Regions:
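N-proximal low-complexity "stem/linker" segments adjacent to membrane-targeting elements
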Residues: 1-31
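Conserved nucleotide-sugar donor-binding catalytic segment
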Residues: 14, 143-229
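Short, acidic, metal-binding catalytic loop of nucleotide-sugar glycosyltransferases
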Residues: 30-40
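A conserved acidic beta->alpha catalytic loop
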Residues: 31, 47-57, 73, 97
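Flexible acidic/His/Gly-enriched loops in nucleotide-sugar-dependent glycosyltransferase catalytic domains
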Residues: 63-64, 79, 107-179
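Glycine-rich, basic loop-to-helix element that forms the pyrophosphate-binding segment
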Residues: 71-88
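Short aromatic/hydrophobic "clamp" motif used to bind/position activated sugar donors
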Residues: 93
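Catalytic core of nucleotide-sugar-dependent glycosyltransferases
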Residues: 212, 216-219, 224-250, 269-282
């Protein structure tokens, strides 16, 4: 729940980066600083295990701030985001990947929606995915519950679109936070955004502006290509952490199918087929499980299927 102290509460946007995309990083930072939102906007850029780029060529306008910090916690995305959250000052906190872009009215529309629905646990929006030379609009559901997230990751609700309440992430007046920080125990931070959404929706729903308010660039090598073990470890961790998946056979089948595909991509064909069977017992239409069987035969390479899926603006 968001407790509004003004009509235009201060917003902090955290960008965690490894510094390898300096030009895209600048585009992301400027897109946040140039928001039409009338309230205070702060961008916190967190450099992870690299020398910080102080972005001195970026103009910072009135009622805007740019803060450059280093990741002082565990290495990787989760620790980077947490370092940024702790260093931030806004009543609302959002994230932006270092190669994504916020549309000018993002904060204005999201804060207005939250003011109308203060009981919401977080606010999101639709996205535009740029992939294969085309832009694909993916609209998020106007309301998403804990049960919805057990059934589906709902990839239209992207981490770069999210806004959370500061007190929900950090607590207030010595009281523990309802949601808490990003989980740094997740192996390779795989699924850290999904874990955060599951924890958040235990306390209330995520509402989304029914417009694409961020641009997500997928015209680059897949983050998951070659990182299949992280996928196996991360998803297995999430299943252990959220026993509620046992209450939703299709949701459990979805994750079992993802693990099956990752195991097949690693060449662990016995494990892949075991997870695929488990998934198909719960949901015979689980395509990831069928895909795992195909990959386990060696007929098609895992990266080939993944690239085909990503060209539709969807993830595995």
């Amino acid at each position: 729940m968001m407790h509004f102290t003004s009509r235009t509460p201060a917003v902090s946007a955290v960008i965690a980066t490894n510094g390898k995309r300096p030009e895209l990083l600048r585009v992301a930072v400027r897109s946040i600083l140039e928001q039409s939102y009338r309230g205070f906007v702060e961008v916190v850029v967190v450099f992870d295990r690299v020398e910080p780029d102080h972005l001195e060529d970026i103009e910072v306008g009135e009622n805007r701030a740019l803060k450059i910090v280093s990741n002082t916690r565990s290495g990787g995305l989760a620790g980077g985001r947490n370092s940024g959250i702790i260093a931030s000052s806004g009543e609302m906190i959002g994230f932006c990947d270092d190669d994504d872009y916020w549309m000018p009215s993002k904060l204005t529309q999201q804060v207005a929606l939250w003011r109308e629905n203060p009981e919401a646990t977080a606010i999101s929006s639709g996205i535009t995915v740029r992939s294969g030379g085309q832009d694909i609009v993916r609209l998020a559901p106007e309301r998403a519950t804990f049960a919805d997230f057990l059934r589906s990751r709902i990839t239209e609700i992207h981490p770069s679109a999210m806004l959370y309440s500061r007190e929900d992430l950090l607590g207030v007046d010595g009281q523990p936070a309802r949601i808490g920080l990003v989980d740094e125990e997740l192996p390779a931070a795989y699924g850290e955004d999904y874990d955060l959404l599951l924890r958040a929706t235990r306390h209330g729903d995520v509402l989304s502006v029914p417009e694409p308010l961020i641009l997500v660039l997928w015209d680059r090598p897949s983050f998951f290509s070659g990182k299949w073990q992280s996928m196996v470890d991360g998803l297995s961790y999430i299943l252990r952490k959220f026993p509620e998946f046992e209450q939703d056979p299709k949701g459990l089948a979805r994750i079992a199918g993802q693990i099956a595909y990752a195991q097949a991509s690693l060449g662990n064909n016995k494990e892949a087929r075991a997870y695929a069977r488990s998934a198909l017992r719960r949901d015979p239409k689980q395509l990831r499980a069928w895909a795992a069987y195909v990959v386990s035969t060696g007929i098609i390479k895992p990266a080939t299927l993944l690239d085909l899926v990503q060209k539709t603006g969807r993830g595995l």
